[in-house]
Amino acid sequence: MSKITKIKGFADLFPPESDVFTRMESVARQVFGRYGFVELRTPILERTDLFCRSIGTETDVVQKEMYTFPDRKDRSLTMRPEATAGVMRAYIESGRHTQEPVSKLFTSGPMFRYERPQKGRMRQFHQINCEVLGPVEPHADAELVLMLMRFLTELGLTGLSLQINSLGCKECRPLYRKALSDFLASIDNAALCEDCRRRMETNPLRVLDCKVPGCRELTANAPTILEHNCPECRTHFDAVLRILDSRNVPYVLNDRLVRGLDYYNRTTFEVVSDSIGSQGSVAGGGRYDGLISQLGGPDVPGVGFACGMERLALMMPGADAPRPHFHVAVLDPAAQDAALLLAEDLRAQGLTGSVGFGAGSIKSRMRLAGKSGARACLILGGDELAAGTVVVKDMDSGEQETIGRDAVAARLLAAGA
């Protein structure tokens, strides 16, 4: 019978990779908690309309990348390609806006996009997302960026570049769109890639986001969106930059930064690295003041970001996994019950470890103890079972001593094992 293998673009995560993800989530909870964020868990499956209305029907995500299928009642469902839309749906449905003026929410979990798998970019990938719902002030944008940079710093990441831009608002962006469309009409459209030719008609701002070198060269002299920001948008953006300057946070003004989703307005930002291959983005986000009302909710502004966990993992410095405190080597089958009870007593006192059940020679039992990585091996054979004792062997020094079974926990704790 042939074996069943995993789907292309999906991965199984064993230690140490899974340990990196656990550490990432732990640091996220610690940092975000200092800023007053609470954790939200949303479903992996949502109605397809949610993403069409939020992300935009003309985006690459909706056009080419979503895992969409009908259920048994022929309702179109989609495995979430990003988290923000689901958070907005949950926020509206729960009536949370009636309970508190400001909501600070974070989520983590798997997302799904049908893309070409590459380094740090899989078809099932994991994100950490933060959303601030309620404030319209630029201080919310700045605080979110500061929190993101603090999170990345506490992960131990270096060599990052914060890029930032302002996409304007519904008042000034149409003027820029017209100026950009006029510019695009004046260049050799045939030299643009197929995606850019399509975007010229549906969403010309996305042409600026194209990574094809030929397209970037052709659009190098395109008008910039910052030049077309209205006074209110420029004041908002300047306030964000002023706060970042006051905290000595370095950034790069990137007037081509438009992000890949249609719901962004005003502040948009991205953190990039040149050490992880194609495109190099590890986190990004921005303001989305019209998204909640666009999904049928109240007119509540918002700002948020997402971090790609696989991409962050490529950059995280190695960290030694904590060693188990003990491993019980059972040398006599008759001692297996006592070994299990001993291990349970030790675990009840906060110690971690394993028991080597099964038959085998003393040599094989000790080899298993060595592979466990434990600091101490607790040897329990027939003689020890009869005497109520345990041989405690220090796995680093090789020294060992025989002590009473009820003294083992104190011995391990005193040794700092």
UniProtKB/Swiss-Prot annotation:
Keywords for the protein's UniProt record, in alphabetical order: Aminoacyl-tRNA synthetase, ATP-binding, Cytoplasm, Ligase, Nucleotide-binding, Protein biosynthesis
Any one GO molecular-function label of the UniProt entry: ATP binding
Among Pfam families, the record links this protein to: HGTP_anticodon, tRNA-synt_His
This entry carries the following GO cellular component terms, namely: cytoplasm
According to its UniProt entry, the protein's GO biological process terms are:
histidyl-tRNA aminoacylation
EC supergroup of this enzyme = ligase
Reactions catalysed, semicolon-separated, are: tRNA(His) + L-histidine + ATP = L-histidyl-tRNA(His) + AMP + diphosphate + H(+)
| Keyword Nucleus belongs to the record | no
- Subcellular location per the Swiss-Prot or TrEMBL entry: Cytoplasm
Q: Does the keyword Nucleotide-binding apply?
A: yes
- List, alphabetically, the InterPro entries matched: aa-tRNA-synth_II, aa-tRNA-synth_II/BPL/LPL, Anticodon-bd, Anticodon-bd_dom_sf, His-tRNA-ligase, HisRS-like_core, HisRS/HisZ, HisRS_anticodon
EC number(s) per entry: 6.1.1.21
Per the record, the major location class is cytoplasm
Could you give the subunit structure recorded for this chain? Homodimer.
Q: Which family is this sequence assigned to?
A: Belongs to the class-II aminoacyl-tRNA synthetase family.
This one is known as Histidine--tRNA ligase
- What organism does the record attribute this protein to? Nitratidesulfovibrio vulgaris (strain ATCC 29579 / DSM 644 / CCUG 34227 / NCIMB 8303 / VKM B-1760 / Hildenborough)
Gene, per the UniProt record: hisS
